[in-house]
C-alpha cells in the first residue's frame, strides 16, 4: 500500500488526506493544533463568524429608518445619537471559538472516517530521498518524544503565521495580531488597524460595525491595493462615510503601550493613539525548521516553497499546498492544490492548477468578489477585453433593500463575447459571483448569460443586465 504523510492539517492537508484515503493510500496527517489549520481555528472561520455579527449591526444601522422600522424606545434620529443596538463582544467571541472548534472536530471525524491516521505533533523531513524512493518524516510530539515515519510521498501544508514589525510586537492585550482578537471580552473603544490589505480591511470594517472608533493605517494610496480599483474606491468611500479615519500613504513604524493606551508612530514622525492596535501586515510561511532545503526542497527568498502546477516541489516525492507555497492565500486554492497533489502522485487523472478560474471574496460590507481577469489586467494590456460596469443603484431589489453602494462588472472577449472575468461589489457578493465563475470556467458567452432567466426582482438581475449590454455592444461592433 502506498504510504503518504501529510504535514499540516489545514485545507490543503485535510482535503489531500480525504482524496489519498479514498484512492486507497495509507495516509497519516501530522498536525500540531487541530485539523482545519489556521483557516478554521484562527483565520477564515473565526473572522467570518465575527463578521456575521458585524453584518447584522451594519444592515440594521444603515437601513432601519429608511425601511420604516421603529425601535422599542422610540429613539429619535439626532446627530451623534446613541446606537439603538449594542454588542456583547465576549459572547460573540465565545461563539466564534465554539464554531471553530466544532468545525475542526467535524473535519477530524471526516478524515478518520475516510481511513486516515491523525497524529498530534510537528513534522520535519529527515534527509534526502532513499534509494527505494521513500522519505523519512520525524514527528515530534508536545512532550518531546519522536517517531519516525516512512513515506512514499510527503505533502507539506503547514500554512503561515502573522508577520510582525520588530518595534510593534503584539502583547496579546492591547497590541494584537489577528489570531489574538478573539480573546477580547470588551469591545475596543478606539481601534487602530495597521495594514489595509484584505485582513486589515475586513477587521476594520467589522469593528467599526460593532461600535469601535476605527483608524485604518494604509501605507498605500488606497485600501485594498490588490483589488479592483473601482471596488476599493467604493469600500473606502463607505468606510469614510461611516466615520472611519482612513490614513492613506501612512506607514506604521512602531507601536507601544502607554498605560491603558497604545501609541503608533508613523514613518513621518506623526503619532496616533488608541485603546487597542491590530497589526495586519501580512503573513510569513511556516517553512523554517522542517529540514526542507536539506531534503532538496527549493525555497523562494520569501521562505515560500516553490511548486509547479501539479503541486510538486523541486524534491522528488515531496509536494506542497496552501499558504506555505505563496501562490494564492485562499482556502479553496489550498484545498485544490492538496487534491491535485494526491491525484498526481497516485496516478489519477488531474488537471493542473488554473488560477484564472479562482473566485475570491473580501468579506467587508459591501463584499468584494472577483474571478478571472481583472480591470488591472485590461489596463496593463495583459488581455484585450470589453468591460461594462453597472451600479446597483439601478437595481430594483437593491432599492427595496436600501442598498446604495456597489456594482456588477463583467469582462468579455471583444470578438467572441466569452466571459473572462468579473467583479461584484454588493451584500453577499460571495454568492453573486458564482454565475460569473461558472461562465469563466466553462467559456460561456455574455449572450448565454443574458439569455438565462433571472428572478425579478433580484440582485442577480444586474448580472444579466451587464451581459446584455456587453452583447449589444458586441453586435454593434460587428455591424
Regions found by a protein language model. Give the residues of each.
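Flexible, glycine-rich terminal cap/loop adjacent to redox cofactors
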Residues: 5-12, 16-33, 38, 45, ...
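Glycine-rich flavin
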Residues: 2, 18-25, 30-187, 215, ...
Amino acid at each position: 500500500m502506498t504510504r503518504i504523510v501529510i504535514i499540516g492539517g489545514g485545507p490543503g492537508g485535510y482535503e489531500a488526506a480525504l482524496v489519498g484515503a479514498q484512492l486507497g493510500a495509507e495516509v497519516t496527517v501530522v498536525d500540531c493544533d487541530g485539523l482545519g489549520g489556521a483557516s478554521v481555528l484562527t483565520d477564515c472561520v473565526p473572522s467570518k463568524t465575527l463578521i456575521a455579527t458585524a453584518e447584522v449591526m451594519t444592515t440594521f444601522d444603515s437601513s432601519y429608518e429608511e425601511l420604516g422600522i421603529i425601535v422599542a424606545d422610540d429613539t429619535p434620529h439626532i446627530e451623534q445619537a446613541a446606537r439603538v443596538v449594542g454588542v456583547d463582544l465576549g459572547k460573540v467571541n465565545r461563539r466564534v471559538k465554539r464554531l471553530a472548534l466544532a468545525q475542526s472536530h467535524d473535519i477530524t471525524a471526516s478524515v478518520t472516517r475516510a481511513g486516515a491516521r491523525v497524529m498530534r505533533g510537528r513534522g520535519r523531513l529527515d534527509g534526502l530521498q532513499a534509494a527505494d524512493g521513500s522519505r523519512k518524516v520525524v514527528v515530534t510530539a508536545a512532550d518531546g518524544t519522536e517517531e519516525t515515519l516512512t513515506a512514499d510521498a510527503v505533502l507539506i501544508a503547514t500554512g503561515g503565521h502573522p508577520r510582525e514589525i520588530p518595534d510593534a510586537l503584539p502583547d496579546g492585550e492591547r497590541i494584537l495580531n489577528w489570531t489574538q482578537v478573539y480573546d477580547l471580552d470588551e469591545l475596543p473603544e478606539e481601534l487602530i488597524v495597521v495594514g489595509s490589505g484584505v485582513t486589515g480591511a475586513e477587521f476594520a470594517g467589522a469593528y467599526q460595525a460593532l461600535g469601535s472608533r476605527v483608524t485604518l493605517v494604509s501605507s498605500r494610496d488606497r485600501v485594498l491595493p490588490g483589488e479592483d480599483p473601482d471596488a476599493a474606491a467604493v469600500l473606502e468611500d463607505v468606510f469614510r462615510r461611516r466615520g472611519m479615519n482612513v490614513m492613506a500613504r501612512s506607514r506604521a513604524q512602531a507601536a507601544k503601550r502607554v498605560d491603558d493606551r497604545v501609541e503608533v508612530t508613523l514613518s513621518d514622525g506623526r503619532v496616533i493613539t488608541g485603546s487597542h492596535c491590530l497589526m495586519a501586515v501580512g503573513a510569513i510561511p511556516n517553512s523554517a525548521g522542517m529540514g526542507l532545503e536539506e531534503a532538496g526542497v527549493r525555497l523562494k527568498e520569501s521562505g515560500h516553497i516553490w511548486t509547479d502546477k501539479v503541486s510538486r516541489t523541486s524534491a522528488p516525492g515531496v509536494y506542497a499546498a496552501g499558504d506555505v507555497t505563496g501562490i494564492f492565500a485562499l482556502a479553496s486554492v489550498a484545498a485544490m492544490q492538496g487534491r491535485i497533489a494526491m491525484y498526481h502522485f497516485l496516478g489519477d487523472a488531474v488537471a493542473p492548477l488554473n488560477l484564472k478560474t479562482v473566485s475570491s471574496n473580501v468579506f467587508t460590507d459591501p463584499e468584494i468578489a472577483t474571478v478571472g481577469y481583472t480591470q488591472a489586467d485590461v489596463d496593463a494590456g495583459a488581455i484585450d477585453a470589453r468591460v461594462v460596469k453597472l451600479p446597483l443603484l439601478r437595481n430594483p431589489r437593491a432599492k427595496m433593500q436600501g442598498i446604495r453602494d456597489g456594482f456588477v462588472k463583467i469582462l468579455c472577449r471583444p470578438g467572441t463575447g466569452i466571459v473572462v472575468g468579473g467583479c461584484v461589489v454588493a451584500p453577499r457578493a460571495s454568492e453573486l459571483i458564482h454565475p460569473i465563475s461558472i461562465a469563466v470556467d466553462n467559456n460561456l458567452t455574455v449572450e448565454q448569460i443574458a439569455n438565462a432567466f433571472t428572478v425579478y426582482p433580484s440582485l442577480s438581475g444586474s448580472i444579466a443586465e451587464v451581459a446584455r449590454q456587453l452583447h449589444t455592444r458586441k453586435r454593434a461592433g460587428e455591424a
